[in-house]
From Swiss-Prot:
TM annotation in the entry: 5-25, 52-72, 85-105, 116-132, 171-191, 212-232
UniProt cross-references to Pfam families, sorted A to Z: TRAM_LAG1_CLN8
Main location: membrane
Family: Belongs to the TLCD4 family.
Record's protein name: TLC domain-containing protein 4-A
One GO biological process term: lipid homeostasis
Gene name as annotated: tlcd4-a
Length: 258
């Protein structure tokens, strides 16, 4: 079977799997085992289920990224045209998740409004379309997906807020520290290294073979994603600083965007 067809089968399966997780597994699981979940409004339950799906996606894709980075010699040897099969499968899983999440945001926009996440998803789609259809830039696509490793900590911070865990408590502080460190490492600290590798490909035969479409999609999506990452890093650092500086008995104002 053609790799492109396999990729789109994985996209479809990923979409259906994550939708099942959102609409059936998560509600039943947490209705049975979480009294907090049962007391939430419909909108908050939707966001809870969405973040549960997001965490599962991040763990699956992030783990696969690390494996590919460590053991896929073909991709590491030729970052533009190396054998992209496993990267394409991982990207397909992400694309299926993004479709599910975008449809979810559209359906529940009034209660889950997040324009920054929509911009993020569309930028990812723009670039990953070339990975799925042409199998180009596998190393750089995989490198980008490693950023998902920070997502579970971001979601856990939200879960702590919802269950009423004080932001000055040790579990919340430790998660906040881990979130800030991992987010910085996988999304911010890697920026110089990433772009140095990008610039190193300019003018090479492999880069020229890409053509203008993939070249523009690659650079534009990277710039958009990194602007968003820097913005989110600032908000995370600011929020963590506020919590650390707050009085132990203080109750900082909760803001989903913090």
């Amino acid at each position: 079977m053609d790799d492109v067809l396999i990729s789109y089968c994985v996209v479809t399966g990923s979409f259906l799997g994550f939708q099942l997780l959102f609409s059936a597994i998560s509600p039943r699981l947490f209705t049975k085992y979480s009294s907090t979940y049962r007391q939430l409004s419909f909108g908050k339950q939707c966001e809870w289920d969405s973040r549960f799906v997001s965490t599962n996606h991040a763990l699956i894709v992030g783990s696969a990224c690390l494996y590919i980075l460590a053991y896929d010699d073909a991709v590491n040897a030729d970052p533009i045209w190396g054998d992209p099969f496993w990267v394409k499968m991982n990207v397909a899983i992400t694309c299926g998740y993004l479709v599910q999440d975008l449809l979810l945001l559209a359906r529940f926009w009034k209660v889950m409004r997040d324009p920054y996440m929509v911009c993020h998803h569309l930028a990812v789609f723009y670039s990953y379309g070339y990975v799925l259809n042409r199998g180009v830039l596998p190393y750089f696509a995989n490198f980008r997906l490693i950023s998902e490793l920070s997502t579970p900590f971001v979601n856990q911070r939200w879960f702590f807020d919802v269950i009423g865990k004080p932001r000055s408590s040790w579990p919340v502080l430790l998660n906040g520290l881990a979130m800030a460190l991992v987010f910085f490492i996988v999304r911010i600290a890697v920026i110089p290294s990433y772009y140095s590798q990008v610039f190193a490909t300019f003018g090479t035969e492999g880069y020229i073979r890409l053509g203008i479409g993939p070249q523009v999609a690659w650079i534009v999506s990277c710039v958009v994603l990194d602007i968003l990452n820097v913005f989110w890093m600032y908000k995370i650092a600011r929020g963590f600083y506020k919590v650390v500086k707050a009085k132990p008995d203080g109750k900082p104002r909760r803001n989903h965007a913090d």
